[in-house]
């Protein structure tokens, strides 16, 4: 990875679109793919093989582990290609192979709050709202429009 303090540390095999907005302290691992509408905040670490696509805003100090996919089209028959997004807050841990879909509905968002610990192979579907300080265990799946309030354990 490059060592320039003025630019994110991006592994040479990662594909980062030139329009993506990454804070200078972001680290991007091998073979990650980051699309043009992605914004990543200060101190976030993106692991290998991560895909961030579509309109995605990720806050500060998140740890995004290998194989995570954020911002893919929703798995919803009502989705017609309308612009929607994923918003991830600060200080979250997303373990291996977590998948978070964009929302259905123009301007709608799938939201993940702050300080959540989402274990491996968790699916967060379209239009979900996750508060803060939540733990979701390995292999859990949240269907579309699920709301999880602060402090929940699933």
Regions found by a protein language model. Give the residues of each.
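Short, low-complexity, intrinsically disordered N-terminal peptides in bacterial proteins
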Residues: 1-9
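Structural signal for interior beta-strand "rungs" in well-ordered beta-sheet cores
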Residues: 9-154
């Amino acid at each position: 990875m490059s060592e320039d303090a003025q630019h994110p540390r991006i592994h040479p095999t990662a594909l980062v679109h030139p329009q993506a907005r990454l804070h200078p302290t972001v680290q991007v691992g091998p073979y990650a793919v980051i699309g043009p509408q992605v914004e990543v905040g200060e101190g976030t670490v993106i692991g290998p093989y991560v895909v961030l696509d579509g309109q995605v805003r990720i806050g500060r100090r998140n740890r995004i582990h290998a194989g995570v996919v954020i911002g893919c089209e929703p798995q919803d028959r009502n989705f017609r290609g309308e612009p929607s997004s994923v918003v991830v807050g600060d200080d979250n841990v997303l373990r291996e192979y977590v998948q978070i879909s964009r929302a259905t509905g123009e301007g709608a968002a799938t939201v993940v709050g702050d300080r959540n610990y989402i274990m491996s192979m968790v699916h967060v579907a379209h239009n979900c709202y996750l508060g803060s300080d939540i733990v979701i265990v390995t292999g859990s799946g949240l269907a579309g429009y699920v709301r999880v309030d602060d402090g929940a354990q699933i």
